[in-house]
Amino acid sequence: MGFFRTLFSFSIFALSLADTSKFIGLDDVDNIIPNSYIVVMKGAVTEAEFKDHQVWASRIHRRSKRDGAADGLDGLKTTFDFQGFKAYCGTFDKESIERITRSSDVDYVEADRVVKMAALNTQRNAPSWGLGRISHKKAGSFDYVYDSDAGSGITIYGVDTGIDIHHPDFGGRATWGVNTVDSENSDQNGHGTHTAGTFAGATYGVAKKARIIAVKVLNAEGTGSTSGVIQGIEWSTNHASSNGLSGKAAMNLSLGVRSSSVFNSAAEAAQRSGIFLAVAAGNDGFSPASARGVCTVAATDAQDQATSWSNYGSTVALYAPGDKILSIYPNGGTATLSGTSMASPHVCGVGAYLMALEGIGPGRVCDRIKQLALESVKNPGPDTTRRLLYNGSGA
């Protein structure tokens, strides 16, 4: 399958550990973060048991540190606890992680891994066509037809490289949320601003009145970690819950990771909390595109052709414009990018648009989008839908 050009490429890898059948091992090892792990608890583990387990794991690490086996390792660093998903990440020596994995409280362990951004194809200031396509039954129009509600009352979390929240196209609707990757609270890459401009910008966006929150999980080079992305998802879920936004929120994830149970679990927990998730399609069972309940998006060009670099398969919910998409860029600029990453925010924006227009809950959004979609995609891959995103404008 062709690799999409702007999807973030994650590689999840595992060490070979003796007698640890609950350790999820994968066959690629190039991007593993040495000695860094994500430990996922069983669903029946209570809050008290989770805290007791953390104390126990920390004690194991301190013992290894005294013995000189864990020099330079921090032990338990970050915990996750939202919507039934309990986990923690940390750096441990081999013997300690083997003991932790054998705990009766632990469901499985995955190696933490580097997140890398694939190369972007950029055509500066090219004409855009995506908004016209998603609001017309026939290809070729550049007019965007939409209801004036335009996502009003809906909040969209952009989990990405950050967002230039001061870009004039947002008109003050964008705010900074959290940064899990570095100390620079800005988009130094551009990808996150571009995707946000597509899902909610005033000029280039679908849901032009939605509120936007920047969740930075990748740095200027487009790199981060699985645990950092999960921190961003958890923060968004908790923020929505504590601010009365559950049921009125969406999340765009223009990123993915090679077949990851922990990533899928985090995405599913966010969806259960009352957030609609639009996710860029990946390659060979990428997560969270393979998670239950998320709306997985592949890419088409202006002629409704499935692009050669977009993923295909049964996990794809529908296609959306992803080739040569014009949107905003940091410092007041614009750029034209291509990729599945550009298709996903079109669907995220339509999801927010329909939530505002029809009052539907996040759990019903993807089905409603598929119901409205056009059977227009040409040459999709084997076992792949022909559905193309349409906002139901009637045009």
From Swiss-Prot:
User: What SUPFAM superfamilies does the database record attribute to this sequence?
Assistant: Protease propeptides/inhibitors, Subtilisin-like
Family the entry assigns: Belongs to the peptidase S8 family.
Q: Where in the cell is it found?
A: Secreted
Question: InterPro entries given for it?
Answer: PCSK9_ProteinaseK-like, Peptidase_S8/S53_dom, Peptidase_S8/S53_dom_sf, Peptidase_S8_Ser-AS, Peptidase_S8_subtilisin-like, Peptidase_S8_subtilisin-rel, S8pro/Inhibitor_I9, S8pro/Inhibitor_I9_sf
Name listed for the protein in its UniProt record: Subtilisin-like protease 9
Give the EC number(s) under which this enzyme is classified.
3.4.21.-
Q: Which segment of the chain is annotated as a signal peptide? A: 1-20
Q: What class of enzyme is it?
A: hydrolase
Which residues are trimmed away as propeptide when the chain matures?
Answer: 21-120
Per the UniProt entry, the glycosylated residues are 252, 391
- Chain ranges of the Peptidase S8 domain: 128-395
Alphabetical keyword list: Glycoprotein, Hydrolase, Protease, Secreted, Serine protease, Signal, Virulence, Zymogen
Can you give the residue ranges of the Inhibitor I9 domain? 36-117
Q: Which Pfam families match?
A: Inhibitor_I9, Peptidase_S8
Q: Which GO terms describe its cellular component?
A: extracellular region
What biological processes does GO assign it? proteolysis
List, in alphabetical order, the Gene Ontology terms for molecular function in this entry.
Answer: serine-type endopeptidase activity
